[in-house]
Every structure is written in structure tokens, then in C-alpha cells.
Curated annotation (Swiss-Prot):
Keywords: Nonsense-mediated mRNA decay. Residues 570-602 have a biased composition (Polar residues). It comes from the Eukaryota. Residues 565-630 are annotated as: Disordered. GO terms for biological process: nuclear-transcribed mRNA catabolic process, nonsense-mediated decay. This is Nonsense-mediated mRNA decay factor SMG8. Involved in nonsense-mediated decay (NMD) of mRNAs containing premature stop codons. Probable component of kinase complex containing SMG1 and recruited to stalled ribosomes. Residues 604-614 have a biased composition (Basic and acidic residues). Belongs to the SMG8 family.
Length: 912
């Protein structure tokens, strides 16, 4: 039989059971627990107690396993606990966790390790008289403090409530008393790590142990793990004996196989000679255990020489002797004598041990176990929560970060806000949350933050966000509407009325009617001129009954639209026939409009433009004292022909279906919109405008400084048939001038017209300005005459959108065309066409007024044509572009060249 016996619970051999159960043998139970770094996980190696080194056995360590060690003639029962703090047990647990995927992060894994160790430690505190906490290093691991503190809370809050009841009901463990344990176990701290102090220097080792004892005692007292009353402490610390031991024997960490091989080689290499005491000692060290290779008789008779040496086993025996003599009473003098200490027989103790093992180890490991005792149930449910200080810490900082993030999100929230604002606020809150949140609870708290923010936004804070025709979202709360006009973005623009005299605030439109018609009807009530001025009526839908609806159609003319865009013609070629002479702007007598009047619409190609620019004429001003700089003068030849008998067959518009969008070149024939998107009014006589001072502020408000001048356009008109009306015109002119000087035939048939034009742009802040060319804003000086020519705006496409010169970098839109007609026996005609490009030049729409004939303007008058504020095709509104620059302005939309023309009129003396 080996000098020391062992078995693994609960498999106790019969022969060992008889030895332990005989004569009610009393034993001091010493628990060995802590950490180990060797594969065998045996922490008794440093005690020099084992006869066979654990490395030579085939037993694999396992979490929660308890191994009993005792000597035949000894009084100490060693309980060796294998826990998750043992390195190789932890490694096996980690490998299983990785393989199964149960633990998804280190925090959770570490929490599991700590919880399992704490269960075993609590169990050891209940069944042991002494506990040796083994540390393989030379430094005390302060992470034990949190475990000790948590176990003290668990014991006081749960264990002392349920354990006495369970022990009483089972008739086992009555010897444990009210404390439900043998005593307040005495803790010994055993450090296996070698220090820099040599084993021979005992005084320094003792000094180190004393200093470590003081530090450990202070930490335990500060955390209230030990108190003056040891019965109320988790465990006790001896008052007058050492409880810290540093192992200075390097053999405790030696590898027996490697050491044996080294010693054998040393022995074999030794010169031959007689044996001495050193050789005998060397041979004994080669044996894997005492008595190896010797007869059983010699082993039984031989006794180990007891040398007085410094060892943990000697320290333990001192404490054991005190336990047998007086018991442990480590309380202060005030509480001394009240402590509970009992040494039961092994048989009695073992029955209680099995019950406590089931309560503290087996039942918590069984996930399906259920108990009727509420206190025990609370213990099982809350043990992990209390022990797991890391998870609690990370949960608390996540909760703290979550609270701050919630407050940050709620701070200064508007009454309603958009999804973009919501996401921005959430990102700000989430950024604040991530400054604090750490650990495995981050994802769960992130989801809580997301749900919280979404719930606030969706429950009464969600903005409608329905986009306006200018791209601004509705600022009202989420609501159901029957009509788009019920939306409101809260954005206010500044715009002028139809005549341009009055500026007012306009709401961001949600329908074409709001943008192109309703606003101008409303502001007309505030304007002193709009409702009294002469105006041109544009064709609109006039229902014949109350049963009318919007037309449903597929734009079959889309291909025709694309082909006509580049030739500057409308698809209806019969209404506007092309010019026969491509190289001359002259109008022949055979080119008559339907009312038999001579008509000219300028639609110049590049070749004609070059020819026109080469013709220079002197300009004359009837009302100006100063002459303008020489500019391009266009000569128009007006011929008088016979009235055409043929009339174009016009299709009557529908009275039951209306056009849902705006009129454009490819709109179905016979469909008209419900309201006009254009406006043409006569502001008054031409004398309103004076080229010296520009457009008066009281007539047209909101113009930028120097940008309120119209551009003069001089057009030379030559008469081919003076006998028609030219002779009468010259006769009246001569009479008016009181002169009878005859003129040559050529000069009497030619005269110059001065027409003042202005293409006006207006930004959303109400800034207005005239442009002198497709890429140039008019810059007129104070007190000087603008010398720019109007031919640039007549013979070029003018962009619909252009950057406003104001500081806010707004986009201005072409909103008005100013025309001051001359005092002459001709009429200026206009036929505006707006081409809006949608991505490419092949995808565009040309919007028209809907009139079948060009508009004839009266003589000597100031006319203003107001263009649509919003454009809408068959598929819906066309959003104004963003990022408009001078270079790309013409790529978004243009007012097409060829808008202006001249038409003859009846001669009367009132015109002169």
C-alpha cells in the first residue's frame, strides 16, 4: 500500500472506505484549490506529499472533479479541487466553446470560467476546515477579491436562508449548526512562483511573506471579506500564525521524466568507483516514487529521514495541531468564543459532503433542474448575475451610455422632423453611446437605442416628407391628404406678380396650379395693376358639363417631338410652314399667315446669323439724346400680297377631357389645360421705359443694381411695295414733321425700328436681373447708357436657369420677357417656346402657350410675358436642376431663339 492514498469522488474504493470509516475517525479537512499551469493540474506537487508524480499518470483533468488524499496514520484529509482556473481545464473548455460556438466573445467565456470556479470555491468553504489557495506565480491575483466579495453576498443573502432548511429536512449535516458549515475556514495563500530570493536566505523569504500578509489582510478588510467576527466573514485569517507561504524548492515545478533522464546520464558518465552517500541520494532521486525497485519489506521498514526544512506541509501541520487542540477562533476579542467549530467523524462528514455537493455542484449544472424552495431557486437564478462582475460592469456602462444617448437624441427635437434628421440625431446619439459602451452587451443596447429612437420618431414625430415641386419635403406631421395642396414644406419664396410691380411671399408649391396660377391670382389682389391691365388670354379647358375628367393617353408623338426639336419647328407643319429661302431672313409675298397679314418669325441658323452680323447700319433714337454704339441691324423685307382663300382647318378643343399637364409640342391635339401657366400683360405706353434711367423702381421692384435696363434692338425694315401703305405712312410722317422735302425712292421704302427687349431672371429670394446674352448678366452703370445689343438675346437660346449674382448662390429662373414696341405701323409678334432638357438633348420637351398663332403686340406699348414657375410633362413635374453654373446653364433648359417677329398693321394717323 502506498504511503498516501487517493480516490476520486464519488468512487471510493471499499478498502479505503473501511479505513476511513473505522472507529469514527476524525479528520481535519483541507481543501486545495486555485490555479495550476501543469497538464495534470495537480496542485499538491508543491507539498512534496505525493509518492508518484501526477505527470506519470494517465488521468485527464476535469472541471469540478474532487480528489481525496489521505495518509493511513494521518489526521488530514486533503480535498483537491480541479476548477476552470486550472490552465488545462480552461483550455479544454475554450476548445469546446469554439467548436460548438456557444461563447461568442471572451467576456462571456471569462464569465463562465469565473462562475464555475466560484461555485466550487463556495462549496469548499462549506465543507473544509482549511483552504489552501494555490497561486503558480509570486504575485497575489487581485481578481480574487471580486469573487470573494460576491460569494460573501451570496452566502449572506441566499445560502444562510435555504441551506439550514435543506440540511434540517434531510437529517444530514445537523452538526454544521446555524452557519451550515464546519467553521469559518482558515485560508492559507501558497505561492509556487520562485522569487529572486535564494532558498538559503530564509530571513528574506520570511520578510517577503510578512509584507505580503499585510497587503492581503488590508485588501480583505477593505472589501469587508473578513471582519472582526469570523462567523460573519466568508473565511478567516489566523491572527498569530503565518498564512502566506512562498515555495523556494525548485523541485516543485520540475519535470520528473526530464530530470530522471538528466540524472541518469550524469550517473552513467561518472567515473567508476565505490558508492558513497551522494550516489545513494542520486539513486533515490532517480526513482519515480519512494520504494521503486526495492522490496516491499524494505519499504515498510524504512522511514524517510525527517529533516527540519521549510515547507508548506510543515505550516499546515501547525494549523492542524491548533485545530485539534483549540479549534479556529479568529474573531476579535469582543466576539471570541462565539465561533462555531466542529470536527465530525469521516462518515458523518462524508454524508453531509455528498448532500452539499449535490446542492452546490450537481443541481446548478443541470439546466433542467427545478426546485420548490423559493430561496434556493433565487440562489440558482442569481448566482451568475452576482458573481459575474465583468458582465455587470459592462452592462452598467452600456446602460449609462444608453441613458446619455437617449437624452442626447431627445435634446432639442423639433415638433416634426424628417428621416434624414432622424438618422442624423441617431448617429449623434450612437456616437455618444459608443464612447461608453463596451463588452458583450453592446449589440443588445445598440438595438435598444435604435428601437427607442425609432419609437419616438414614429409615435408623433415623423415628418410627412412628401416632396414639393421644388424638392422640399413637407414639414407637417405624418398625415393622410386628399389633395396635394394640403402639404406644406414651410419654405417661403419671394416672387413678383404677373406685371412685376408687386413682390410677395409665396409658399412652396405642391401642384402645378399652385405654382403657375393660384399664386399669381392671389398676389394680383394686392397689386394695383394686375387686374386692370390689358392682357392676352391663353386657351384653357372649358367644360360643357360637370362630367369632365383628366385625359388618359400615351404620348405617341414622342418620336415626332424629338425630330422637331433640332429644327426649331413644331410637329404641326401646316400651321407654321418653313421658310423657303434658307439664306435670307426676307419674307416673300407668298408667305402669308391665315389672316393674310405679312408675318416674319426669326429662326436663324448659324449661316444666317453670320450674314446678319456682317450688315451694319446706323441706329436712330426717337426719344434718346445720345446715340448708341454701332450694332447688328437686321433688315426685314415686307411684301404685300393677296389674301389667301384657304383657311387651315382647326380642330375644336375637347369639352369633356382636359390636359393633366402643361401644353407642349407633343401634347395630343384638342386637349387644353384647366388653367394658363403663362401670362402676357400690357404694362402701359412705351414712355414708361426710359433708356437713360432704366426700368423705374416703382414700376418694377426687386431689380439688382445696374441690371434693370432693357436692351435696344434696331431692325431695318425695307418696303418692296410702297404703293400699298408705305406712301400713306410717309405722307403722314412728312405732315407731322411739317416738311415737304421729297425723298428718294430707296430711302422712302426703308426705315429703322427700335425695339427694347429684356430677358428677366428671378431667384427664389426675389432678386431680379436682366441678361445681355446667354452667359452674361447685364451690368449697367449709374447715369450711363447700356450699349449692349438686344440681338444676342433674339438670335440665341437663353437658358431657363442661371446662377444668381447675389451672395446666397441661389439659382435664378427666367420668369419674364420685357418688350417695348416701337411707334410704327408694324406689330411685334412673339411666339415663346421653352425647351426643358431631361438628361440629354434627345430627351426633352418643348413647352408652348397653346395659341395657334403668334401673339401680336400693340404698338408703342410696354408688354411683359411671364413664363411658368414650374414645368410639367406628361409623366409629372420636372424638378428644377441643382448645381447650375454658367458653363452648364444651357444644358438644363432654354428659351428658344426665334421668339420675336414683325407683322404689318393698318396705317392710321393716330399711330404717329
Amino acid at each position: 500500500m502506498n504511503p498516501i492514498n487517493s480516490f476520486i469522488f464519488p468512487d471510493i474504493p471499499k478498502d479505503l472506505g473501511k479505513i476511513l470509516m473505522k472507529d469514527d475517525q476524525q479528520l481535519i479537512v483541507v481543501g486545495i484549490i486555485g490555479k495550476s499551469s501543469t497538464p495534470d493540474c495537480n496542485k499538491l506537487v508543491g507539498f512534496n506529499l505525493l509518492t508518484i508524480h501526477p505527470a506519470l499518470t494517465d488521468t485527464d483533468p476535469r472541471d469540478g472533479r474532487v480528489k481525496f488524499y489521505f495518509e493511513n496514520d494521518g489526521k488530514i484529509l486533503y480535498l483537491h479541487f480541479e476548477t476552470t482556473f486550472d490552465q488545462h481545464v480552461m483550455a479544454d473548455l475554450l476548445a469546446k466553446a469554439v467548436q460548438t460556438g456557444i461563447q461568442d466573445n471572451f467576456i462571456n467565456f471569462n464569465s463562465t470560467v469565473r462562475t464555475r470556479f466560484a461555485r466550487v470555491l463556495l462549496f469548499a468553504i462549506q465543507v473544509c476546515h482549511m483552504i489552501v489557495l494555490v497561486e503558480p506565480s509570486s504575485v497575489f491575483d487581485t481578481s480574487y477579491l471580486s469573487i470573494f466579495k460576491s460569494l460573501k453576498i451570496i452566502r449572506e443573502k441566499y445560502v444562510l436562508k435555504f441551506l439550514p432548511k435543506l440540511l434540517k429536512s434531510s437529517n444530514l449535516g445537523n452538526y454544521m449548526g446555524k452557519e451550515a458549515r464546519l467553521c469559518s475556514p482558515r485560508f492559507i495563500f501558497f505561492f509556487e512562483g520562485t522569487s529572486n530570493i535564494k532558498p538559503e536566505d530564509v530571513e528574506k523569504l520570511d520578510g517577503l511573506e510578512c509584507s505580503v500578509e499585510e497587503e492581503i489582510y488590508k485588501m480583505l478588510r477593505n472589501e469587508f471579506i473578513i471582519t472582526n467576527n469570523s462567523a460573519m466573514s466568508l473565511f478567516s485569517i489566523p491572527r498569530s500564525k503565518k498564512f502566506v507561504f512562498y515555495n523556494s524548492d525548485k523541485r516543485a515545478k520540475s519535470n520528473p521524466l526530464a530530470d530522471s533522464i538528466d540524472l541518469l546520464m550524469k550517473y552513467l558518465n561518472k567515473p567508476a568507483g565505490g558508492q558513497n552517500d551522494d550516489d545513494e541520494d542520486l539513486m533515490s532521486r532517480l526513482r519515480p516514487y519512494d520504494g521503486y525497485g526495492m522490496s516491499a519489506w524494505s519499504v515498510g521498514k524504512s522511514k524517510r529521514a525527517e529533516k527540519k526544512e521549510r515547507s508548506i506541509l510543515a505550516l499546515l501541520k501547525e494549523h492542524v495541531a491548533e485545530a485539534f487542540e483549540h479549534g479556529f477562533d479568529d474573531s476579535a476579542s469582543k466576539y471570541r468564543g462565539r465561533g462555531h467549530f466542529v470536527i465530525p467523524s469521516f462518515k458523518t462528514w462524508y454524508e453531509g459532503f455528498k448532500l452539499l455537493h449535490k446542492i452546490f455542484i450537481d443541481n446548478p449544472s443541470n439546466s433542467s433542474y427545478e426546485t420548490n424552495d423559493p430561496d434556493y431557486k433565487a440562489f440558482l437564478q442569481n448566482f451568475h448575475k452576482i458573481i459575474d462582475i465583468d458582465e455587470r460592469f459592462f452592462a452598467e456602462i452600456c446602460e449609462h451610455g444608453l441613458e446619455l444617448a437617449m437624452v442626447n437624441y431627445k435634446d432639442m427635437l423639433p415638433h416634426h422632423y424628417s428621416s434624414t434628421f432622424h438618422e442624423k440625431k441617431y448617429e449623434q446619439a450612437h456616437e455618444l453611446f459608443t464612447r461608453y459602451a463596451r463588452g458583450p452587451e453592446v449589440e443588445r443596447h445598440e438595438q435598444k437605442l435604435k428601437d427607442y429612437c425609432d419609437s419616438i420618431w414614429l409615435n408623433g414625430k415623423q415628418q410627412c416628407e412628401y416632396p414639393s415641386l421644388r424638392g422640399n419635403p413637407c414639414a407637417l406631421g405624418k398625415h393622410k391628404v386628399k389633395d396635394p395642396t394640403e402639404h406644406s414644406s414651410g419654405v417661403i419664396f419671394v416672387s413678383a406678380c404677373n406685371c412685376g410691380r408687386t413682390q410677395g411671399h409665396r409658399e412652396d408649391p405642391y401642384t402645378i396650379r399652385q405654382g403657375n396660377y393660384d399664386f399669381y391670382q392671389i398676389i394680383a389682389k394686392s397689386c394695383s395693376s394686375c387686374n386692370v391691365l390689358e392682357r392676352v388670354k391663353f386657351p384653357v379647358f372649358e367644360p360643357s358639363s360637370n362630367d369632365f375628367r383628366a385625359a388618359e393617353f400615351i404620348n405617341k408623338n414622342l418620336s415626332n417631338l424629338m425630330s422637331f426639336e433640332h429644327s426649331n419647328r413644331t410637329p404641326d407643319a401646316s400651321t407654321h410652314p418653313p421658310m423657303t429661302n434658307e439664306n435670307s431672313p426676307h419674307l416673300s409675298g407668298s408667305q402669308k399667315s391665315q389672316d393674310s397679314a405679312s408675318n416674319l418669325t426669326f429662326s436663324m441658323d448659324e449661316k444666317r446669323d453670320e450674314e446678319n452680323k456682317s450688315q451694319k447700319f446706323g441706329t436712330q433714337g426717337e426719344d434718346e439724346d445720345e446715340t448708341l454704339e454701332q450694332e447688328t441691324v437686321n433688315e426685314i423685307v415686307i411684301k404685300v400680297g393677296e389674301h389667301s382663300e384657304d383657311k387651315a382647318i382647326l380642330r375644336q378643343p375637347s369639352t369633356t377631357e382636359y390636359l393633366p399637364g402643361m401644353l407642349h409640342a407633343a401634347s395630343p391635339a384638342g386637349l387644353l389645360p384647366q388653367f394658363p401657366s403663362w401670362s402676357l400683360v400690357c404694362l402701359g405706353p412705351s414712355s414708361i421705359y426710359t433708356h437713360n434711367s432704366g426700368i423705374p423702381e416703382h414700376v418694377q421692384s426687386g431689380f439688382l443694381s445696374g441690371a434693370n435696363f432693357l436692351l435696344p434692338w434696331d431692325v431695318s425694315v425695307r418696303l418692296e411695295h410702297a404703293q400699298s401703305w408705305a406712301a400713306s405712312y410717309e405722307k403722314i410722317r412728312n405732315r407731322k414733321k411739317n416738311t415737304s422735302q421729297p425723298k428718294s425712292s430707296e430711302s422712302s421704302n426703308t426705315f429703322t425700328l427700335k425695339i427694347f427687349l429684356g430677358v428677366e431672371y428671378e431667384c427664389l429670394r426675389g432678386h431680379r436681373f436682366i441678361m445681355s446674352g446667354p452667359d452674361t448678366v447685364l451690368r449697367g452703370g449709374s447715369g450711363s447708357i447700356v450699349r449692349d445689343s438686344g440681338s444676342k438675346v433674339v438670335f440665341n437660346d437663353m437658358p431657363i436657369y442661371f446662377p444668381c449674382p447675389c451672395r446666397s448662390s441661389n439659382i435664378a429662373q427666367l420668369m419674364r420677357v420685357h418688350v417695348v414696341t416701337p411707334k410704327a405701323p408694324v406689330n411685334v409678334i412673339v411666339e415663346p417656346k421653352v425647351r426643358i432638357l431631361q438628361g440629354t438633348t434627345q430627351n426633352c420637351l418643348t413647352f408652348t402657350t397653346g395659341l395657334t398663332e403668334p401673339i401680336k403686340l400693340s404698338q408703342s406699348a410696354y408688354w411683359i410675358l411671364r413664363l411658368p414657375f414650374i414645368y410639367e410633362g406628361d409623366s409629372g413635374p420636372l424638378m428644377p436642376p441643382a448645381g447650375v453654373t454658367v458653363a452648364n446653364a444651357a444644358t438644363h433648359g432654354v428659351l428658344m431663339a426665334g421668339m420675336f417677329g414683325i407683322r404689318e398693321s393698318e396705317i392710321s394717323e393716330e399711330l404717329l
